[in-house]
């Protein structure tokens, strides 16, 4: 598999610059990444220490769903007074988040969630969280498990523009090819452009 046909929508990030990029990014965003948990499995968690990010995992035990549609969430409170009720919506302060190191199949799963929550009546809380999120996927050069079936369900191992990712990282050995998947990602990456270079034409 080679880079997207739209090479003007792709950049190169040298691996030695990745940590510096993420360190600066964490000043502006809450960073969620795959990390090794105490039980020995991998979880998508808030990143406090960049050294805990682990990209050599197969799948995480949790999914993106819990960040956008948690099992429990307080959405309003109410007061009963003189036989009537007053509803007080909870004005949740939603952080801007970057989800880094995602598998292609997990990103495609979010597309199905988006479709469901786009139906009327729209879930405004879901979209409040979703619109403040950037999804950065890592294409699988090799399936992490023999049981993976993403090829048959068209959920990976590589994604095309419009298939859910904002940025897609493809491992090219010493470098990452970084593909831009959305207009939102194009705006997102502008403050960090100094970490990226244009790809060599030979990659096409």
Please identify what each model-predicted range represents.
Residues 5-204:
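Iron-sulfur-associated redox domains of electron-transfer enzymes in respiratory
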